[in-house]
Amino acid sequence: MSPEKRTLTEVEGRRLSLSNLDKVIYPDAGFTKADVISYYLHVAPVLLPHLAGRPVTFTRFPDGVGAPSFFEKHVKKGAPPWLRTVKVPRRSGDAGRAVEVIEYAMIEDLASLVWAANLAALELHVPMWRSVRDGSFGDFDTMVFDLDPGAPASMVECCAVARWLHDVLGDAGFEVVCPKTSGSKGLQLYVPLDPRRPGDEVRALAHGLARRLERDHPEAVVSNMRRDLRKG
């Protein structure tokens, strides 16, 4: 195994040690880690406002998109001392008992974004709430519907369900719906909430709307998240 190539740099007054900038991350395009970092810098004005205040979970591809990836929630050991983090209790069960405390990274400026890009964190996952105190949940500012088609359904059927859901949301008074692709063939519909709402209220509302859609289109929609129920 060849030794790591380290490059020292400074981003907005904060020192960073970058590694293996010539490593190919996207083989088909020949994009290297340096290209990924450059891309993150270019999209930062649009990306950072969406990440600000939200604990971030990474999907990392250290050997490129053709190799295995992994999720990372806990802040990596050796993270720079200036990186802002937040400790969030992970809760389980009906009683909401805290079973673990996870220290997440907060990606809120160029330096922390470059740090994440250097880890080959090609996916940045954030919750629908912003942290208002150390680890406490703020009210939700977004409601998300995840449309995940089961075989043999494809993106075509997924788009049809998205249109039905758009109509259901319109009937419920939500005029703004922002779709985006998710995974290889899924869709997510983002619904901005203004004013913000408590998480329990948002979850109950989303489940109710999903069940209504299932009731209207039982041949095409399943509101339960169990994968074995997604029969095309």
Where are these regions (language model features)?
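SsDNA-processing nucleotidyl-transfer enzymes
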Residues: 2-12, 42-151, 155, 159-163, ...
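Acidic, metal-coordinating catalytic segment for phosphate/diphosphate chemistry
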Residues: 17-31
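Glycine- and acidic
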Residues: 25-29, 144-151, 191-195
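Short, conserved interaction/coordination micro-motifs, predominantly
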Residues: 36-37, 44
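Long, well-ordered alpha-helical scaffolding segments within enzyme catalytic domains
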Residues: 39, 155-174, 202-217
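Flexible helix-coil linker/hinge segments at domain or subdomain boundaries
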Residues: 172-177, 196-197, 207-232
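Short, conserved phosphate-binding/catalytic loop or strand-edge motifs used
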Residues: 181-191
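Catalytic palm subdomain of template-directed nucleic-acid polymerases
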Residues: 190-204
